[in-house]
C-alpha cells in the first residue's frame, strides 16, 4: 500500500508521513511550496520523495491524504478523484492510525506542541512510545503500546480521537475564522474531553477548563491551590525553575529543571500528571524531564557572540507574552527585541489590541507584513500591520530589505516570532553577526 500526502511539508502532515514510513508503508508526497521548509530535513532522512509538480506516480493502490490547507479543488485532489482513489483528511488518517494504540492526546490553544514533545520524550525513555508532534516530528513502532499526539481544535479535528488520557493545556479563542465565540470553543473542548476513556487532565488555573460540561473524570493541575496536582515552592532563576509537586496534598517529588517561564511549569505539570497516574517514579520522571532539549521552533536559540537569536512559533498574544517573559527570566540583563509577523488578517483584526500590549513588553518591536495563509486582503479592508505598529511604544515596520535595522541590536536577545519561519531576516542578521 502506498500513501500520497498532498501538502506534505506542513508540520502535522510531515510527521504523519514519518509515522506511516516507520510502520512499513511506502510514502510519497506533494507540496505547492517549492521553498525549503524545516520539515523537509526529516523527510529527506527517511528517503520520502516530495514532488512539487505533476510528475508523481500514483496508481489504484494509492491512498491519498489531504492537508486541511489543501482545497478539494486542488489539481492533485481532482486527479485522485478521477482515479477513484480513497482520500482521507489528515486528522482522519491520524485517527485511524493512533486509535490502534493506547492514545494520549494533547490539546489546547497554547503549549500543546511543547507539552506533547515533553511527554513523548519522557515516555520514550521510560518504556517507549509512538508520537506525532506539531513541530514536524513523528515516530512509530508496532512494538510500542502508547501513542502521544498533538490534537488540534481547528474545525473540531480532535473529535476523531479516542484517547485514554485527554490533556487540555488551556482554552482560549483562536481560529476566529471558524469558531463563532468563546462558548463555541468550550463546547468543542467538552466534546473532545468526553471522548476520553480513562480521564481528562486539564490546567485548572485556566478559567475556561472549569466550564467544561463533562461526563468523564477530570484531574486538574496548576499553581493555584484548588487543583488536584499543584506546583509549590516555585523558584525562577536564570538557570531555570525548581518546584515541589503535591498530588491531592501528598508530596510527589521535587523537580529542578532547565525551563523558563510559568508556562513551562504548567506544561511540565501536564506531563507529570500522566506519569503519576501511570505510576511512574517521580525521580525517574524528573531525570528524564531534565534531558529534554526542546521542541522545534519553540524558544530555539542560536548564540553568536553576545547576541542571542530565538526562533519561536508564537503568533497568538498569549504565546508572544510567554516568550518575552521567558527571555527576560533567562537573560535578565539583556535588551529584548521582538521581530513579529502577524499571522492571518482575521487573527490580526481580532487580537490587535492584545498584540500591542504584549509587544510593548519588549524593549523594541519590529513588525512585518501580515502573513495571509488561506485569507485574502480584499476580505479585510483596512487590516494591516500599521494598526499594530501605530500604537507601539517603540515599534516600527521591517521587511527583508530593511533587515539592517537589526544591526543596532547586536548584543541583545532578538526574538523571531511567527508560525512561518522568518528565514530571510534571520539569515541576513546571522550573516552580519558572523562577519
Regions found by a protein language model. Name each.
Residues 2-105, 120, 226, 230, ...:
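Short, basic phosphate-binding NTP loop
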Residues 61-63, 145-146, 164, 198, ...:
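Conserved acidic residues
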Residues 64-67, 149-150, 168, 202, ...:
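Redox-cofactor binding/interface segments in oxidoreductases and associated redox assembly factors
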Residues 12-16, 114-118, 265-268, 319-320:
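Short glycine/serine/threonine-rich phosphate/pyrophosphate-binding segments
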Residues 19, 23, 72-200, 204-217, ...:
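Phosphate-binding loop of NTP-binding sites
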Residues 49-60, 136-139, 398-406:
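Short acidic low-complexity segments
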Amino acid at each position: 500500500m502506498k500513501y500520497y500526502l498532498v501538502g506534505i511539508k506542513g508540520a502535522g502532515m510531515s510527521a504523519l508521513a514519518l509515522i506511516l514510513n516507520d510502520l512499513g508503508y511506502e510514502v510519497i508526497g506533494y507540496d505547492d511550496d517549492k521553498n525549503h521548509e524545516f520539515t523537509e530535513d526529516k523527510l529527506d532522512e527517511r528517503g520520502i520523495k516530495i514532488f512539487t509538480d505533476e510528475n508523481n506516480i500514483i496508481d489504484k493502490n494509492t491512498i491519498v491524504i489531504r492537508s486541511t490547507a489543501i482545497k478539494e479543488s486542488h489539481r492533485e485532489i481532482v486527479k485522485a478523484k478521477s482515479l477513484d482513489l480513497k482520500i482521507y483528511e489528515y486528522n482522519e488518517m491520524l485517527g485511524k492510525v493512533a486509535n490502534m494504540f493506547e492514545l494520549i492526546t494533547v490539546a489546547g490553544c497554547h503549549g500543546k506542541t511543547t507539552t506533547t514533545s515533553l511527554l513523548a520524550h519522557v515516555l520514550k525513555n521510560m518504556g517507549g512510545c509512538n508520537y506525532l508532534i506539531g513541530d514536524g516530528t513523528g515516530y512509530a513502532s508496532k512494538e510500542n503500546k502508547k501513542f502521544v499526539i498533538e490534537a488540534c481544535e481547528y474545525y473540531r479535528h480532535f473529535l476523531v480521537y479516542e484517547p485514554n488520557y485527554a490533556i487540555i493545556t488551556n482554552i482560549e479563542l483562536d481560529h476566529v475564522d471558524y469558531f463563532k465565540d468563546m462558548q463555541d470553543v468550550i463546547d468543542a473542548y467538552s466534546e473532545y474531553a468526553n471522548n476520553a476513556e480513562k480521564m481528562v487532565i486539564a490546567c485548572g488555573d485556566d478559567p475556561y477548563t472549569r466550564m467544561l460540561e463533562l461526563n468523564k473524570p477530570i484531574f486538574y493541575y496548576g499553581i493555584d491551590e484548588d487543583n488536584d496536582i499543584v506546583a509549590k515552592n516555585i523558584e525562577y532563576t536564570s538557570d531555570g525553575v525548581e518546584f515541589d509537586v503535591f498530588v491531592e496534598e501528598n508530596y510527589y517529588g521535587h523537580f529542578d529543571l532547565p525551563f523558563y517561564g510559568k508556562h513551562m511549569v504548567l506544561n511540565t505539570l501536564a506531563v507529570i500528571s500522566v506519569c503519576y497516574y501511570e505510576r511512574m517514579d517521580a525521580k525517574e520522571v524528573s531525570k528524564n524531564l531534565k534531558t529534554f532539549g526542546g521542541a522545534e521552533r519553540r524558544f530555539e536559540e542560536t548564540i553568536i557572540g553576545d547576541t542571542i537569536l530565538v526562533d519561536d512559533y508564537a503568533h497568538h498574544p498569549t504565546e508572544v507574552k510567554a516568550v518575552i517573559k521567558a527571555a527576560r527570566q533567562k537573560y535578565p540583563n539583556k535588551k529584548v527585541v521582538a521581530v513579529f509577523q502577524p499571522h492571518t488578517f482575521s487573527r490580526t483584526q481580532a487580537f490587535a489590541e492584545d498584540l500591542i500590549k504584549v509587544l510593548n513588553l519588549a524593549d523594541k518591536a519590529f513588525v512585518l507584513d501580515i502573513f495571509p495563509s488561506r485569507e485574502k486582503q480584499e476580505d479585510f479592508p483596512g487590516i494591516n500591520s500599521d494598526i499594530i505598529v501605530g500604537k507601539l511604544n517603540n515599534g516600527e515596520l521591517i521587511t527583508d530589505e530593511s533587515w539592517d535595522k537589526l544591526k543596532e541590536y547586536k548584543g541583545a536577545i532578538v526574538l523571531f516570532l511567527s508560525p512561518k519561519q522568518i528565514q530571510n531576516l534571520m539569515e541576513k542578521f546571522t550573516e552580519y553577526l558572523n562577519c
